[in-house]
Amino acid sequence: MRDRLAEVGFTEARADAIVASVSGDIDGSNAAELRRAVAERVPSTARSLIMDLTQTTYIDSTGIELLFELARRLSARRQIFTVVVPKGTGVRKVLELCDIGSVAVLVESQDDGLEAVDAA
């Protein structure tokens, strides 16, 4: 049995950057709930979304699909999508295998995410 289902918290790191910090497991049982939460908390006026997966312990194909969907939606709204996940973690390895870096900026920390927003 895996750890626990995902919990998400939102903060405004700066006026132009909303951070969604996800802890626990992202899978088919909660991806729709996570999708709704992000849709409700990230307005089209925000410049960027930083999805912090530092405390995410597991992600399945439904969670990966969610990240690609978010990337498409944010790109259509000309918003920057950054995913924070430390190197060497299982979640990072999965995301690299799925080439999430082709649709989002993949970084190791929230500070790196903010730098990516500044550079865009």
Language model regions located:
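A short, flexible N-terminal coil/short beta segment enriched in small residues
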Residues: M1-R2, L70
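STAS-typified acidic loop motif
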Residues: R2-R36, L53-Q55
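Short, solvent-exposed coil/turn elements at secondary-structure transition points
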Residues: D25, K87, Q110-D112
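Amphipathic alpha-helical interaction surfaces in cytosolic regulatory modules
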Residues: G28-A104
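Short acidic-hydrophobic, aromatic-tinged amphipathic segments that line or gate anion-handling sites
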Residues: V103-S109, G113
